[in-house]
Amino acid sequence: MASTVANILKTISDKKALALFETIALTKPNTDILIAKTQLTRKQYYSRMSGLMRSGLVKRKNGRYTLTAFGKVIDDIQRTIKKVINEYYWKLKAIDSFEVADGGLSKEEHNKVLDTLIDNEKIKKVILANIS
């Protein structure tokens, strides 16, 4: 399977496959430990593991599963996504609502709101780059 964005996202969009992927990233376990920790049936386990390996995210080395270099990068990206969802989702929704209300905010007001709500410079940079 070619590692396209759609294939990678499809592979880790399954909750059980993502749990398996995250467990491998944290512990480098063997098969029995993975099945126990993720509470998957053997069939579910092998099906998800096959997808993770075909996508180039996971490899088996000396009887243990580990992330590939590509898998480590994808793991870091998915952790960033999780952090943005957990910490910034509602703040970003609030910023969107200010932009819609009363014809929007001036650039100065927008920057003030952004500085107040968002402490992550990378997120601020992304938002500011897309202001029309």
Task: Annotate each PLM feature.
Residues 1-19, 106, 113-114:
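Short alpha-helical segments that sit at the start of domains
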Residues 53-64:
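A short, conserved structural fragment
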Residues 34, 45-55:
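Basic amphipathic alpha-helical segments that dock to polyanions
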